[in-house]
C-alpha cells in the first residue's frame, strides 16, 4: 500500500472513529435510557480507535 492509499484509508478510519465517538456521546446523553447498549457502543468505539491508531502508526512509518 502506498502513502496516498494509506492517507485515504486513514481518512475513512478517522470518519468511522469520529462517528463511533459521537454514538457513544449520544448514548451517554440518553442515560439511563438504553443503558444496556453501553458495552456494544463502547466496544465499537474502542475498535474503531484501535484501527485508527494503527493506521496512523503505519502511515508515520511509511513516511519515515
Where are these regions (language model features)?
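N-terminal acidic leader/helix
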Residues: 1-28
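Short, charge-rich amphipathic interface segments used for partner binding and complex assembly
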Residues: 29-64
Amino acid at each position: 500500500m502506498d502513502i496516498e492509499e494509506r492517507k485515504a484509508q486513514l481518512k475513512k478510519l478517522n470518519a468511522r472513529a469520529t462517528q463511533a465517538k459521537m454514538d457513544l456521546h449520544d448514548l451517554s446523553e440518553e442515560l439511563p435510557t438504553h443503558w444496556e447498549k453501553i458495552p456494544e457502543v463502547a466496544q465499537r468505539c474502542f475498535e474503531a480507535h484501535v484501527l485508527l491508531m494503527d493506521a496512523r502508526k503505519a502511515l508515520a512509518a511509511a513516511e519515515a
